[in-house]
Structures are given as structure tokens and as C-alpha cells.
């Protein structure tokens, strides 16, 4: 068996057995976009299907047209999925409705590996159960913390806590594969400054145009609780940012300066090898799982909002313990981290050999060009 074929099979085993909890003999519906839509690798759903069949699953395809402004779950899709044991989204629709409460009582999974290279890398092959355990451990540690302090080389500096907010945290109702973030923390008890380089960009909820807003210099966004309270930096950038926020808010009838929640990446094998401007939509939908990125949901009083802010190489200190340090996640600094690394060898391999590429420009920062 060729090496790439072996890796693809291992990744699909991880998806179907570890993530979906499936077994041979069950049925699988693959929801996919048209081949020429360009977001997902055109062959990705076929690679998954081929390996799923070899693993003993019955596979059916459900092609779906991309809707940039989807409002609800398509009824025909809900009906079709009822006949399958597992529904796998190789389509942006899964990301767009990931916080929807009306998900059927079935296994629905959104694939965040957007091409075959991502799928067969350690991103797709590292044990799903191991990253699920890391996510749970991080969630527990963050929710219990008295003080969380975040900085970055560009000048971000904010702090606060999420105690007593466990019931307020909003996680997706569709499973992610791979698991690449912890449950987003509400900003209710946080305040400070976010340093944004390069651009403002959409969250994958709705695909408006223009999807990004270029910044020439570092823009500082001040916030307190759930509200953006000010912009500081180059005058042209401030004007552009305010106008972009207002444009998106007016388009959807939402609060422009509401800031909902934040999270950082937890999967060190998540890589984005092209510069972000090569496809802002693909970058926004795929790169965020790398620990070098910390991501805010803003513009709209709901997760994930419509505009994301992205911090590069964060240091996240939790009650004095630097769980993320200069963009490197240290699971061994979590209470149960060393045990998890020993229990899941592929987890340790991923953390020992982290992917560095996250779509930065030539200057080593996010860039509009």
C-alpha cells in the first residue's frame, strides 16, 4: 500500500471510528459542495468515501450548492440524513450551522481538513480521543481559573476570568473533526486590548462581500466585557475598521461592536501553507486550530458572530501557568497533561513536531497582501 493511501485510511479510521463512534456495516452520508466551488479539495469527499467503503461502511453522496447566507438547516437535508447512521460535512454548510440548536439526534460531523494533505497529515491522523481529552482538560482548567492573562508580540493585553460562566459557554452542536479548539470563553468578565494585524475577516457564519477588510498597520481594539469600546492606531485603519463593522452589522441587522467570545487553537498539526490572502475564506475556515492563533468572535450577539479578530503567537497565562507561550501550547503544564501525552502517543508526536505555517506574510505577521 502506498504511504499516502495508508495515511488516508488511518485518517478515515480516526474520523469514522474515533470521532463518529461508527462500526462496519453502518451507513454514511457525505454532504459535499460542487467540485468547482474551490473551498474544499475537489477530491476530498471521494478519498473519504473510498476509504469508508474499504472499512465496511455503506456510503451515499449528498451534493449541495453553497449558500453564502444560509439561515436554517435545509429541510431536504434533514430528511435525507435520517436514513444514514452518520452524516459527514465536506461542505461549508456544516460550519455555517455549527451552532444551530435544531440538529437532528444523529451523528453529524464537520470536517475541518479542507484538502487531502491536511487529512493525511498528523492533523487528521492524531488520535481524536486524545485531542478530545485535551480539550476537556483545557476547558476544566480555564473555567476554574481565577485569572487568565493574554499577551502577544504585537501588543495584545487582556485579562479576566470565566468562572461561573460554564452554563454560558457555547459549543458547536455538530462534532468537529479534527478537534482543534477548546470551548469558546465568553468575554463577559474580560477586558483589555487586542492587537490586530493584516485584516479583519469573516467567521464562516455568513459569506458577505467584501469578506475581509485590509489594515496597513497594527490596529488596537479595546474592549470591556461584551463590548468593543474603542479603536486605536492609524487613522485610515480606524476608519476602515469602523466602516466594515457597520457594513456587516447593517447587512444582517446586528450589533456591530458586540464581542461574544474567544478561543485559541489546540491542534499543533493544523497547518495553512499558503499566505492567507491566497484565499481569505479558506484561511478563516481552516487555520484557526493552530495554537499560534487566538480568535475572537465579534459583530453580533451570537456565536460565532460575523467578524473575527486574530492574534498571532499568544501567551495565555492561567493562574500564573503559561499554558500557551509565544504560540506554543504546552499540554504538559495542565494538571493531567503528562498523563494524556503518555496515554496517546500520536498526541505527543503532534506536540513534539508542531506545524509552523499559519498563512503569515513575508514580514512574519498577518498581511492583506
Write out the residue ranges for each language-model feature.
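Active-site bordering "gate/hinge" segments
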Residues: 1-218, 224, 255, 321-327, ...
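A short, hydrophobic/aromatic-rich structural module that often spans a beta strand
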Residues: 75-91, 240-254, 277-290
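Structured core elements
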Residues: 193-195, 220-222, 230, 263, ...
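Histidine- and/or cysteine-centered catalytic micro-motif in compact active-site loops
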Residues: 197-199, 224-228, 233-236, 265-269, ...
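Short conserved micro-motifs at the rims of enzyme active sites and ligand-binding pockets
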Residues: 206-207, 233-234, 273-276, 306-309, ...
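Long, well-ordered mid-to-C-terminal structural blocks that present hydrophobic/aromatic surfaces
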Residues: 208-250
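Cysteine/selenocysteine-centered motifs that mediate thiol-based redox chemistry or coordinate metal-sulfur cofactors
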Residues: 253-307, 311-313, 356-369
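Mixed-charge (polyampholyte) low-complexity IDRs
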Residues: 287, 292-304, 309-348
Amino acid at each position: 500500500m502506498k504511504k499516502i493511501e495508508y495515511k488516508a485510511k488511518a485518517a478515515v479510521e480516526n474520523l469514522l471510528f474515533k470521532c463518529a463512534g461508527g462500526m462496519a456495516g453502518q451507513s454514511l452520508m457525505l454532504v459535499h459542495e460542487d467540485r468547482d466551488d474551490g473551498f474544499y479539495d475537489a477530491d476530498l469527499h471521494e478519498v473519504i468515501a473510498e476509504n469508508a467503503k474499504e472499512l465496511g461502511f455503506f456510503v451515499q453522496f449528498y451534493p449541495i450548492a453553497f449558500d453564502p447566507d444560509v439561515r436554517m438547516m435545509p429541510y431536504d437535508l434533514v430528511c435525507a440524513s435520517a436514513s444514514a447512521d452518520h452524516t459527514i460535512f465536506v461542505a461549508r454548510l456544516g460550519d455555517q450551522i455549527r451552532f444551530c440548536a435544531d440538529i437532528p439526534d444523529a451523528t453529524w460531523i464537520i470536517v475541518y481538513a479542507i484538502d487531502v494533505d491536511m487529512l493525511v497529515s498528523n492533523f487528521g491522523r492524531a488520535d481524536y480521543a486524545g485531542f478530545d481529552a485535551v480539550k476537556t482538560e483545557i476547558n476544566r482548567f480555564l473555567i476554574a481559573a481565577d485569572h487568565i492573562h493574554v499577551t502577544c508580540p504585537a501588543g495584545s493585553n487582556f485579562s479576566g476570568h470565566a468562572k461561573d460562566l460554564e452554563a454560558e459557554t457555547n459549543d458547536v452542536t455538530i462534532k468537529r473533526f479534527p478537534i482543534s479548539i477548546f470551548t469558546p470563553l465568553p468575554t463577559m468578565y474580560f477586558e483589555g486590548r487586542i492587537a490586530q494585524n493584516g485584516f479583519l475577516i469573516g467567521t464562516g457564519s455568513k459569506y458577505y462581500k467584501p469578506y475581509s477588510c485590509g489594515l496597513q498597520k497594527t490596529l488596537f481594539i479595546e474592549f470591556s466585557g461584551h463590548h468593543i469600546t474603542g479603536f486605536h492606531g492609524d487613522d485610515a485603519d480606524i476608519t476602515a475598521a469602523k466602516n466594515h463593522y457597520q457594513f456587516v452589522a447593517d447587512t444582517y441587522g446586528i450589533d456591530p461592536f458586540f464581542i461574544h467570545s474567544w478561543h485559541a487553537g489546540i491542534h499543533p498539526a493544523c497547518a495553512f501553507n499558503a499566505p492567507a490572502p491566497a484565499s481569505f475564506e479558506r484561511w478563516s475556515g481552516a487555520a484557526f486550530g493552530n495554537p499560534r492563533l487566538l480568535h475572537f468572535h465579534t459583530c453580533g450577539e451570537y456565536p460565532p458572530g460575523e467578524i473575527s479578530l486574530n492574534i498571532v503567537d499568544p501567551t495565555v497565562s492561567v493562574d500564573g501557568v503559561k499554558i500557551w507561550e509565544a504560540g506554543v501550547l504546552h499540554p504538559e503544564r495542565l494538571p493531567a497533561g503528562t498523563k494524556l501525552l503518555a496515554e496517546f502517543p500520536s498526541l505527543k508526536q503532534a506536540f513534539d513536531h508542531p506545524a509552523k505555517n499559519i498563512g503569515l506574510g513575508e514580514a512574519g505577521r498577518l498581511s492583506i497582501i
